[in-house]
């Protein structure tokens, strides 16, 4: 299904609105949602970490988990993500976020062009 006149994709797999932090790639149904995510993820990370710290003080880096939660809140038309160039389910992305909690830094997000199939296969090798 192509994008509508207002630039909305109902099938996230076809969307050209893409954000990536090199490991994880999120697809958005509209440019509005993409911009909302890119403009707000750093602030959401701070809020998310404050919520966690109220319950327990933890040495782990919760940024990726916060980013996944924020993506789920912003994108209202589904969930579509790639993990290192391959399709990933909601659960697989969460497991990845739990694995990288021990890393001190989380990469920042940026808008990218939707990778073509050939480029995607190169990144998987």
Swiss-Prot record:
The lineage of its organism: Viruses, Duplodnaviria, Heunggongvirae, Uroviricota, Caudoviricetes. Keywords: Activator, DNA-binding, Early protein, Repressor, Sigma factor, Transcription, Transcription regulation. GO terms for biological process: regulation of DNA-templated transcription. Belongs to the phi29likevirus late genes activator p4 family. Residues 77-96 bind DNA. Mediates, together with protein p6, the early to late transcriptional switch by stabilizing the binding of host RNA polymerase (RNAP) to the late A3 promoter. Activates transcription from the late A3 promoter and represses the main early promoters A2b and A2c by modifying the topology of the sequences encompassing early promoters A2c and A2b and late promoter A3 in a hairpin. Proteins p6 and p4 bind cooperatively to an approximately 200 bp DNA region located between the late A3 and the early A2c promoters. This is Late genes activator p4. The gene is 4. It comes from the Viruses. Interacts with host RNA polymerase (via C-terminus). Interacts with DNA; binds to the A2b, A2c and A3 promoters. Interacts (via C-terminus) with the histone-like protein p6. Pfam families: Phi-29_GP4 (PF05464). The keyword Disulfide bond does not apply. The record marks 120 as: Interaction with host RNA polymerase and activation of the phi29 late A3 promoter. The keyword Repressor applies. GO terms for molecular function: DNA binding; DNA-directed RNA polymerase activity; sigma factor activity.
């Amino acid at each position: 299904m192509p994008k509508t006149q207002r630039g909305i994709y109902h099938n996230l797999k076809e969307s050209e609105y893409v954000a990536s932090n090199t490991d994880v790639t999120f697809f958005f149904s509209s440019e509005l949602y993409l911009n909302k995510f890119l403009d707000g993820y750093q602030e959401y990370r701070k809020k998310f970490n404050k919520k966690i710290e109220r319950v327990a003080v933890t040495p782990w880096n919760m940024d990726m988990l916060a980013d996944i939660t924020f993506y789920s809140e912003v994108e209202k038309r589904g969930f579509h993500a790639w993990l290192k160039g391959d399709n990933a389910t909601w659960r697989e992305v969460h497991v990845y976020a739990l694995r990288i909690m021990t890393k001190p830094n989380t990469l920042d997000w940026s808008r990218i062009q939707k990778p073509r199939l050939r480029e995607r296969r190169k990144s998987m090798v």
